[in-house]
């Protein structure tokens, strides 16, 4: 794994990879909007090409992440480029693959999620979304396949989560316990470093496994649905991802804005009181 001297450089590469992907997603949203608005029933091949390109772009992104995580994976579990809101929703360095299917359920027209569906699918305030073969038209066979996929994905998520828990328990096990009571501090530090290196290597493996599950889940969903449905699903998912990033950023700006205001008020008050005391001494 990376040494402390190179960790910062690797984190910057990871951050650059993330923002590059966010830029690509923004372009995907524009392309999907245009494709859905201009779609004709006999032009599914155009949507198929676009959907295929987007899936391939996601695969390239996960492969690049995997390469960078093998060099240092710690940053992916609490990224500095994310807001606390986003980091609180992370699972193994990203979103849960099962959340992809939750988006589908939302788009299918559940009454409890109608407003969310309308927001996610909003292409333009003045344009109605009304495509033949949309997510609201999923048939029984498609729903059955998606439900089966949902169950399998959750099982795989649980397995990865359990592996992660085992790694965490191992870190606090014998190597760390022995180091805590080591009389030779230098030898103790070496033991701890070895244990933490093994932990980070193990977490990098699990993150790669999680990224593969994310990609495979996306690919299988696209295989089940029609080109129009796939485009709507991808548009909704990307809008949600970018919106979460923006919501988190705005919340932090508001929060830190309040903190700065309070701090300025406190500092100003102290300064005023100090000036009063000074004037009394003169």
Swiss-Prot record:
Organism: Arabidopsis thaliana
Name of the protein in question: Protein DOG1-like 3
Pfam families, per the entry: DOG1 (PF14144)
Gene: DOGL3
PANTHER family registered for this protein in UniProt: DOG1 DOMAIN-CONTAINING PROTEIN, PROTEIN DOG1-LIKE 2-RELATED
Membrane-spanning segments: none
Gene Ontology MF term list: sequence-specific DNA binding
DOG1 domain boundaries: 11-254
UniProt note: phenotype after gene disruption: No germination phenotype.
GO annotation, biological process: DNA-templated transcription
């Amino acid at each position: 794994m990376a040494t402390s001297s190179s960790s910062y450089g690797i984190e910057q590469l990871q951050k650059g990879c993330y923002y590059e992907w966010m830029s690509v997603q923004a372009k995907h949203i524009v392309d999907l909007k245009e494709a859905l608005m201009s779609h004709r029933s006999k032009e599914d091949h155009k949507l198929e090409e676009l959907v295929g390109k987007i899936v391939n772009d996601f695969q390239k992104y996960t492969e690049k992440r995997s390469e960078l995580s093998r060099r240092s994976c710690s940053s992916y579990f609490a990224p500095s480029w994310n807001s606390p809101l986003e980091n609180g929703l992370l699972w193994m360095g990203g979103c849960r693959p099962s959340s992809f299917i939750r988006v589908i359920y939302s788009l299918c027209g559940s009454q409890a999620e109608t407003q969310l569906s309308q927001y996610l699918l909003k292409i333009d305030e003045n344009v109605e979304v009304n495509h033949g073969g949309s997510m609201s038209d999923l048939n029984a066979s498609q729903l059955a396949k998606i439900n089966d996929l949902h169950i399998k994905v959750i099982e795989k998520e649980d397995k990865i989560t359990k592996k992660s828990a085992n790694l965490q328990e191992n870190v606090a096990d014998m190597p760390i316990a022995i180091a805590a009571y080591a009389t030779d501090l230098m030898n103790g530090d070496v033991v701890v470093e070895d244990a933490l290196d093994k932990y980070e290597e193990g977490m990098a493996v699990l993150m790669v496994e999680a990224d593969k599950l994310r990609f495979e889940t996306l690919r299988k969903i696209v295989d089940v649905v029609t080109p129009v449905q796939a485009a709507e699903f991808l548009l909704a998912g990307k809008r949600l991802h970018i919106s979460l990033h923006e919501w988190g950023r705005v919340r932090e700006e508001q929060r830190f804005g309040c903190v700065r205001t309070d701090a300025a008020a406190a500092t100003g008050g102290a300064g005023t009181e100090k000036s009063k005391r000074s004037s009394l001494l003169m």
